[in-house]
């Protein structure tokens, strides 16, 4: 696993509760921001970029030319004074990302995995080497994904959900998350497990290694190792045999980096 350190439910609750809540915005403007009235003008009459950075404001572009295109990125409360005297949709446009958000997205630059555009991965998620996260997947805070595991398109891993090594969570599947109450147990999926498309694994359920959850199943009870479960609610329909193992085998080439 890389990146985050494993957190308990109580630690996640404290992390969210104590986090500075931010409304991140990206402002694109032509015109000059109100550096003086916002208190960001240096003695030499130029923008005080150090003071801006200390407030978490990132500025891009030529701020010495009035009508050149500029970009300002930061928390709305810090950025708003810079727009005094300017007119929205005339002098500038704003893109918002959330409102009073407590948990940023995960910085994935150091992760040795394949993460496709459009995946939403929150901070404090652990991702193993050669894992694959497909577009549209949503991974909530505290989730863990083992080495070589694929999270397919549109799948959802709720808070603290855990998936072992070399497993596959099918498109649209949901592993229910548990952050509150803190005493509740999260979903745990073992190694070499296949969870079919649009299946749902309810809070606290454990799926044993080597098992298969059929597409569309709703799993409300623990699943033993090396069995196939199907239905609503899911029930064991057979043990894993050679034919099933062949049909559900993973493709290593998809995990190459």
Curated annotation (Swiss-Prot):
It comes from the Bacteria. One of its GO terms (biological process) is diaminopimelate biosynthetic process. Pathway: Amino-acid biosynthesis; L-lysine biosynthesis via DAP pathway; LL-2,6-diaminopimelate from (S)-tetrahydrodipicolinate (acetylase route): step 1/3. GO terms for molecular function: tetrahydrodipicolinate N-acetyltransferase activity. InterPro entries: DapH (IPR019873), DapH_N (IPR013710), Hexapep (IPR001451), Hexapep_transf_CS (IPR018357), Trans_hexapeptide_repeat (IPR050179), Trimer_LpxA-like_sf (IPR011004). Its EC number is 2.3.1.89. The keyword Transferase applies. It catalyses: (S)-2,3,4,5-tetrahydrodipicolinate + acetyl-CoA + H2O = L-2-acetamido-6-oxoheptanedioate + CoA. The keyword Electron transport does not apply. Catalyzes the transfer of an acetyl group from acetyl-CoA to tetrahydrodipicolinate. Belongs to the transferase hexapeptide repeat family. DapH subfamily. This is 2,3,4,5-tetrahydropyridine-2,6-dicarboxylate N-acetyltransferase.
